[in-house]
Amino acid sequence: MTRKEQKEERRKAILMTALALFVERGYYDTKIADIAAAVPMSTGLLFHYFASKEELLLELVKMGLQGPGSVGDSGDVPPDLYLTMFLGKVFSFAEEQPWVFNMFVFMAQVRRVGMPEEARRLAQSVDAVAPTVKLIKKGQKDGIFRKGDADTMARCFWASLQGIMEEMSADKNMKAPDPGWIVSMLKA
């Protein structure tokens, strides 16, 4: 392994360790020394990779923004099938990359008041609800989804996914539910 590859592996180890500790203990209760000890490496060496805990936080938020994606335009695919396939992809990706479960928990934490403002603003910059509202309205128009406030329905869809990911983060033995179960709450 080259030095460059070793450095990238070390960087990834720091990020994954920080992610796990931030989810477990919270951002403010996790010290740089805790992260360094868990990697393991010296605190001084960790600062060669990240100048501060907030820089590390921002890097994790940027990773979270690149996650498994968001709901987009379904094209000719019926909205219920599209959402079912979307959830299937999210669960599949998370099972292949277990840190994704922690990332869902982490991103929810970062969006809360009291977190460093730059990280909070960045975490809030992605709107998953608006495209989901459009998709639900299309499904309502086509008679696939129940009548009701599409914004509330979209928020409930995402809250369900968030809750599932949090449970799977806490219980490593939990299996992903059938995506159809989640989509069925929207159906007429």
Region spans (language model):
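Short coil/turn segments at alpha/beta junctions that flank glycine-rich nucleotide-binding fingerprints
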Residues: E24-R25, Q97, D142
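Helix-turn-helix
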Residues: E9, A13, T17, L21-E55, ...
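Amphipathic alpha-helical packing segments from all-alpha helical-bundle domains
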Residues: G69-D73, L81, M115-D142, D151-R155, ...
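N-terminal intrinsically disordered/low-complexity leader segments
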Residues: M1-E8
